[in-house]
């Protein structure tokens, strides 16, 4: 939908994979701010801060759950990104960086829906931590049947160990 947003997201994922967690958080903040500007279009001037734009979004919100979550995601990205940039010490905070990636993913989904309108294919996309970390699709994308069959097969290969009873 937007090449610049794609590049920002891709770079944030690379930074995370290389364990540059603070830079990842900063990049997701940039992504969130760019999404905000794109949504507001001409209503946001170059002088408006990220806080100003989040307030504009709050003012024009209709009260839907999707809008509320979108604004919360943007605020989280702003807060985490600012904390990483202005921190006095280096923190290897992989969990916060991972949450930033997840929230930026959600913000991108909401941006796509805002730009193109409701789309069940876009709305059904799921964030996959395992894919991000290992490069392989995680079990989150498997059907219940697939998960069941894998567990069943795994149980056949390694039956539970029995303990000897003491008589």
Please give the residue ranges for each predicted region.
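Amphipathic alpha-helical interface elements
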Residues: 1-166
């Amino acid at each position: 939908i937007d090449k610049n947003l794609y590049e920002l997201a891709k770079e944030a994922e690379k930074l995370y994979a290389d364990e540059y967690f603070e830079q990842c958080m900063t990049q997701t903040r940039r992504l969130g701010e760019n999404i905000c500007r794109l949504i507001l279009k001409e209503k946001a001037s170059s002088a408006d801060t990220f806080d100003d734009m989040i307030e504009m979004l709050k003012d024009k919100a209709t009260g839907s759950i999707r809008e509320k979550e979108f604004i919360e995601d943007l605020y989280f990205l702003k807060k985490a990104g600012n904390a990483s940039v202005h921190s006095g010490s280096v923190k290897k905070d992989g969990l916060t960086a991972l949450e930033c990636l997840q929230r930026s993913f959600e913000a991108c989904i909401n941006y796509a829906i805002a730009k193109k309108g409701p789309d069940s294919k876009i709305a059904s996309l799921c964030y996959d931590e395992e894919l991000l970390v290992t490069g392989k699709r995680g079990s989150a994308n498997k059907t219940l049947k697939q998960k069941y069959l894998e567990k069943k097969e795994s149980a056949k290969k390694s039956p539970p160990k029995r303990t000897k009873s003491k008589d």
